[in-house]
């Protein structure tokens, strides 16, 4: 708890699941603290769960609280560049996030994953593999449980997904191993450019014993000398080799598992599996005990998930594809018998969607564009239709469906124009898929 030296007044900025986990954690410390919460929303989620001795200011900022704090704990959604935080920064007040508080408190090994795409799958898969090896494992961070809530599980190993937003306010997190999966354009509404975004991601390596990088994406390599292990589709530390005409996932030249035995489909999931293997190997976990999980694991909800399959028509929920690279990954692994009915759109976060054009050109498809930035997709391909909502898009495409077709939601955008989050968007798609499948 060394980070709390001299701290008496703490201001938590942003409530919700993460903010509540911070308040709960602070109340458990042995130090006597005055805790106050600021949330710009009029009725922030979780406000009714705050204890009476924690004061809440909602509906705007409270500058007096901020400049008189000893420590400010910000929600990942609050950028450090926010002008409201500048007076506190200028005054030298320490600003951290929930992951930094986790770093001060954790007393078991931690491994962590970041990247533009695939990090949720790798985090979840790594956790499942560790559990299969008999290790008491807690999984969370930017996925599932807030990191501070995981401490209650008293785990032997913590597996964290970390976003660039979380890493901005994290500086002392010691990791047995850290993986930087890939880097592609995302969150350009938050960062000044790709270099700025990359630097936020690279913070994951600051105190990592082993840094796992992507041989096919040199942007994932740290700028300073570190202990590196790499993954890729060629032979290397962790890669692919061919033996007797069969492709294997391998550690150096040692085959571990045939690629066709993986429960996950798509080339990108070979890479995801290699990262999980590399992380667990670095953490000293017996790989032999984990490989069966690779055979049975079939992925996350909202990530290339078949939610309905009726009359030869498959409905695929890929709502977690909130950027262009995620949608490109989904399209690259498709096996189509008929036409693809692709649903795209939402909040584009300043992204350049033109990268999708070559992938779209090679597919038998019709694209339905909806949401705040749906109009930005229409010019990418002449086989496009602009709709107000996803409901309207599905009602429009449904009468045209034939056996062998696929309806895929892979929006390449954030969801918060029309939905609370990507999960709510995926749930809405799943409900519509099941409804229309019954009717067909």
Curated annotation (Swiss-Prot):
Keyword ATP-binding listed: yes
The enzyme class is: ligase
Per UniProt, subcellular location reads as: Cytoplasm
Q: Where does the chain bind ATP?
A: 115-121
Its annotated pathway reads:
Cell wall biogenesis; peptidoglycan biosynthesis
Q: What is its EC number?
A: 6.3.2.9
Q: What does this protein do?
A: Cell wall formation. Catalyzes the addition of glutamate to the nucleotide precursor UDP-N-acetylmuramoyl-L-alanine (UMA).
Q: What protein family does this chain belong to?
A: Belongs to the MurCDEF family.
Protein's name according to its UniProt entry:
UDP-N-acetylmuramoylalanine--D-glutamate ligase
Say which species the protein is native to: Aliivibrio fischeri (strain ATCC 700601 / ES114) (Vibrio fischeri)
């Amino acid at each position: 708890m060394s980070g709390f030296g001299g701290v008496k007044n703490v201001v938590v900025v942003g409530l919700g699941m993460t903010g509540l986990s911070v308040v709960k954690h602070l109340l458990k410390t042995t130090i006597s603290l005055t805790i106050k919460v600021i949330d710009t929303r009029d009725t922030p989620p979780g406000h009714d769960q705050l204890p009476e001795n924690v004061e809440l200011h909602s509906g705007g900022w409270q500058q007096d609280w901020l400049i008189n704090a000893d420590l400010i704990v910000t929600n990942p959604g609050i950028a450090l560049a926010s002008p409201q935080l500048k007076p506190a920064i200028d005054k030298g007040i320490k600003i951290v996030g929930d992951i930094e508080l986790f770093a001060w408190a954790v007393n078991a090994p931690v491994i962590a994953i970041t990247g533009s795409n695939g990090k949720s799958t790798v985090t979840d898969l790594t956790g499942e593999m560790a559990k299969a090896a008999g290790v008491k494992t807690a999984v969370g961070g930017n996925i599932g449980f807030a990191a501070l809530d995981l401490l209650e599980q008293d785990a032997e190993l913590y597996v964290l997904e970390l976003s660039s937003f979380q890493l901005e306010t994290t500086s002392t997190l010691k990791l047995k191993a850290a993986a930087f999966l890939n880097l592609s354009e995302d969150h350009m509404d938050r960062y000044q450019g790709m270099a700025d975004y990359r630097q936020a991601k690279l913070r994951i390596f600051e105190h990592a014993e082993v840094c796992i990088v992507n041989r096919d994406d040199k942007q994932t390599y740290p700028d300073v000398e570190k202990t590196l292990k790499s993954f890729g589709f060629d032979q290397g530390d962790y890669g692919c080799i061919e033996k007797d005409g069969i492709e294997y996932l391998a550690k150096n030249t040692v085959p571990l598992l045939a690629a066709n035995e993986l429960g996950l489909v798509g080339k990108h999931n070979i890479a995801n599996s290699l990262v999980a293997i590399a992380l667990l190997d670095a953490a000293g976990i017996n790989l032999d005990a984990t490989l069966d999980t690779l055979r049975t694991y079939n992925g996350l909800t909202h990530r290339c998930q078949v939610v309905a399959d009726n009359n030869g028509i498959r409905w695929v929920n890929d709502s977690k594809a909130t950027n262009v690279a995620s949608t490109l990954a989904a399209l690259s692994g498709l096996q189509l018998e008929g036409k693809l009915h692709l649903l795209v759109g939402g909040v584009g976060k300043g992204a350049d969607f033109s990268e999708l054009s070559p992938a779209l050109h090679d597919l038998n498809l019709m694209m339905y564009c909806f949401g705040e930035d749906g109009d930005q997709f229409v010019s990418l391909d002449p086989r496009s239709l602009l709709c107000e909502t996803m409901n309207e898009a599905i009602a429009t495409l449904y009468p045209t469906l034939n056996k062998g077709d696929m309806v895929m939601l892979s929006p390449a955008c954030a969801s918060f124009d029309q939905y609370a989050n990507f999960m709510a968007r995926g749930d809405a798609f799943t409900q519509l898929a099941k409804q229309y499948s019954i009717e067909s």
